[in-house]
Amino acid sequence: MLRSSRITAGTCVSRGWHSYTTKTPTKTAIPPAAKSSNEAKDLILSVLQSAATKREAKTYISRYAPLTGVELQKKKEGLVQRLLGVGKEQDNKEIENLTGHAPEGLLGDSEGTLRVAIIKIRDIKSIEDDLIAQMGETIARLSRLGVSPIVVVDAGKARNDFLKLDNKPFRHYQKLILQKVFKISDAIDAASPDVGARPIEGLFSMNKKGLRLAMPQMLMHPLSHGKVPVLAPLAYDDVTSEEKLVMADDVVHFLTQKLAEVPANILSVEKIIFVDPLGGIPSVERSGAHVFVNLKQELSDIAAELHMGFIPPAQREVHLANLKAMHKALKFLPPTASGLITTPAVAAIPSVGRNPIIYNVLTDRPVISPSLPVELKKTPTLETTLLREGMPVITLKSDKGLNLITEHEKGNIDLDRLWHLIEDSFGRRIDKQHYLNRVNGKIAGIIIAGDYEGAAIITWEDIDPVKAQEDRDAADRAAAEAAAAYAAGIPLPSPPLYQKLGDAVPLNPNQVAYLDKFAVLKRSQGSSSVADVVFKGMVMSQFPNELLWRSRKNNPVNKWYFDRSKGSFKIPGSEWCMFWTGRKTREQYLERFVDICTRIEPSLREEL
């Protein structure tokens, strides 16, 4: 039976608090302070156990400051006081623009920031009750971890049926939607009475310009008390004086835009999370979901991939809508913000290390690295996609060999910034002239990510120097003959098919692509995905067939390299460990690869 008296349009009715009670007179209730302390210890332990590095644990604690019980409520009460009228004059002006109400005076202060995660749940009707209960536990855990969740319920089939004008009254569909809102709210309440949820209808109104917040306090009040707002996708139309169903994606877009206008020291939207029965964005290559999507670089390619016909059209449209909605929302947020798309079953996983939502809050990374080669058996298939607005990526490639000075003069790269990136990453000074003498004219590829946050320089190295030189001489003669024929008006033959297929280019029998420099700014190392973006560009786009590299045996990054390599070999009598990966690696040349890795002289000198 629908409990319509609990919530009405334009109001937010508080729901009863659950209190701890004992089942028998012989047992004693756990004191709130002790319970809060135990929860805090458990949370800190989960952070330290789940974060892969000390840096990730430190970043999480500094950002989210996990608090429980009374501590959590006090912190968020202070934050909402700032939201409703505290702080600098400029802050007050921006808050007034957001809420439509002037602040009412200095009520308190807090040094923290409200860290918001907007969660959209689609097709709730298809989700089993036990999964909804477990999802409620995940949402409650997010709150205890210092995140402030806002749940947006998708109207789904109810909205589609209403738009088809099947003659049923609006109230019929309103009830169906509110049933979904209550179902999610009850799951959160059951999971954690201390956190609790607040179902909200009447938060939005709309006119010809779009959505607006009709009563901002309905959202801010539960947030201030550590409660989880669960929003119905309903809005009052100021033009027609009717309440209407709205798209959940439009609600996510609007909320993100408006909350992004709040000063960052008061409120920050950190995560956009879509829980969808179809899961993450599907990948042809992975036979599962894309692990990570750098939207600035990959959006158009992935949209085109979804039209390849490997999934039914109805599913394709849902994935495209999710991709578009994520892109629109993340554009309003800082680069550190991220989006997640996963299934209800995965969102319900209780394990911290396996639940991608919880894991991403703790580490700011996907459960597995996106740069793990797809063809390796140790790379699992996932149903979750992590998305960021991301960073632009510059890629240069040449079969004959690039020259760093020439590319700098052309404006394709900034060599000074590239030097700085390499030295900052390695903590050593680079002998520039020595390096240029070695690599110029033999650079196979250059990848630069973001604002020179990460880069890779790949060179062509001779497997058999004599035969390699013969090949280069033959290529020069062929080029000269082709130029002479063209000048004489003789038509040139069509290029071989492999030249049109890109990654199907056969391996040069006398050369190998060698990762000479792989650098990431120290401030971008760890969870920013820069290393993954660069490495993925090398092994999945530029050089998918074969890539060779070396690393000092004591390099702490070697574990990361081991996970991404097809094989490795510690070279006896040297300080080097050799790695190789790719679809068509030539293990028969390993002895010659060892020669390459041992004969290259380092260009990095003394420590900075």
Swiss-Prot record:
Instruction: Describe the location of the N-acetyltransferase domain by residue ranges.
Output: 402-604
| Gene Ontology CC entries for this record | mitochondrial matrix
Molecular function, one GO term: L-glutamate N-acetyltransferase activity
Q: What is its EC number?
A: 2.3.1.1
* Location in the cell: Mitochondrion
Q: Which reaction does it catalyse?
A: L-glutamate + acetyl-CoA = N-acetyl-L-glutamate + CoA + H(+)
Pfam families recorded: NAT (PF04768)
Q: What UniProt keywords are attached to this protein's entry?
A: Acyltransferase, Amino-acid biosynthesis, Mitochondrion, Transferase, Transit peptide
The pathway this protein participates in, as annotated, is:
Amino-acid biosynthesis; L-arginine biosynthesis; N(2)-acetyl-L-ornithine from L-glutamate: step 1/4
Q: Which EC class heads this enzyme's classification?
A: transferase
Role played: N-acetylglutamate synthase involved in arginine biosynthesis.
| Name of the protein | Amino-acid acetyltransferase, mitochondrial
Native source species: Yarrowia lipolytica (strain CLIB 122 / E 150)
